[in-house]
Amino acid sequence: MPTLKGIPVVTSGMKVERDGVRAIKDGVKHNPRAEAAPRGRKPSWLRARVPSGEGYQAVRDIVRTHRLSTVCEESHCPNIGECWNAGTATIMLMGAVCTRACRFCAVDTGNPKGRLDHDEPAHAADSVRLMGLSYVVLTSVDRDDLEDGGAGHYAACVNAIREVNPETAVEVLTPDFNGVPEHVHRVVDARPEVFAQNVETVRRLTHPVRDPRAGYEQTLEVLRLAKARRPDMLTKTSLMLGLGERDEEIRETLEDLRAVGVDIVTFGQYLQPTRNHLPVERYVSPAEFADYRRMGLEMGFLEVVAGPMVRSSYRADKVLEKNNVGLESAS
C-alpha cells in the first residue's frame, strides 16, 4: 500500500478526479461496522431544510464563479441553507482533496502532489468583497504533501482578504501542521481575529475517529502555540458528540482545553455522512447540549455554542459580538 510520510493512504473505494487530482470519494474504504450499524429515523430536532432561496443561490453562484471549495458543501453540512441564505460561507482553501482520511469526514482523500492554486488568495478576497461579509471563516483540507502544510497559503489568504476587505473579521480553522511551531506561528502572525483547530472528540476516541497523523495532544499543542504567540487572539475548538464519549470524558477534554487557553468551544451532533463512515452511537438531546454548554461556561470559557445542528463554523460571527458573551444556546 502506498504511504504518505510513513502513513498508509486509503487506496480502495470509488476513485474520482478532482481538479486533476485522483482521489478516493468520501475519503474512506469499506467499513464492516456499517453493515451492523443500527438504522432508524433521526430525531425530529435533526431534520434540516432542503437548501433553497435567493441568498443560497447567490452564494452558490459566487462560489462557482471563483472556483472556491466550501466546507459547507464538502462536509455535507446540514446548515448550508441557513448560512448561505444569510450571505455567509466558510471558504475551504487548497482544493477539495485531503491527504488524510478521518473516519467521520466525507471529504475526498488523495495525494495532490503539491498542487496549489496560487490565485486563490485573490479569489477568496474578491469573493468576500462580493458577498459583503463582515466575518469570514477560512478552513482547508489537510495538505501533508506541502512542506509547510499550507501555512504560507493560509497567511497569504488572510493578508489578501485584509487588503481588499479591511473591515472584515477573519477566523482560520486550520489543519494541525503536524504540530510544527513555525508553521502555526506563520498563520498566527497574519493576525486573524480567531484561530481554531478542532480536537473533534475525546482522548480515548481520537483513534479510530481521526486519521493516524492527527492526535489529541497534537491539537492541544497547536492551540497552546497559537495562544502563546498572540495572547490577545481568540482560540477555538470543536467536538462532535454521539460517537460513544462519556460525560466524564467531555469534562476532562474541556479541562485540557482550558489548560492551554482555549476561549471558545462548539459542540454538535455527529451524523454519519455515508454507510462507510463511523456509525452514530447515540443522538444527543437538545437538553443535554444545554447542559454541556453550562458546564463549559462554568469552567471559564468565554463562549460555548452547543446544539444538535451546530458545526464548528456555525454562527461564528455572533460569537465575536459583545465581547463573546450573551450568545443564546443553539438548538
Swiss-Prot record:
Its EC number is 2.8.1.8. Signal peptide: none annotated. [4Fe-4S] cluster 2 binds at residues 98, 102, 105. The keyword Repressor does not apply. GO terms for cellular component: cytoplasm. Keywords: 4Fe-4S, Cytoplasm, Iron, Iron-sulfur, Metal-binding, S-adenosyl-L-methionine, Transferase. HAMAP family: Lipoyl_synth. This is Lipoyl synthase. The lineage of its organism: Bacteria, Pseudomonadati, Pseudomonadota, Gammaproteobacteria, Chromatiales.
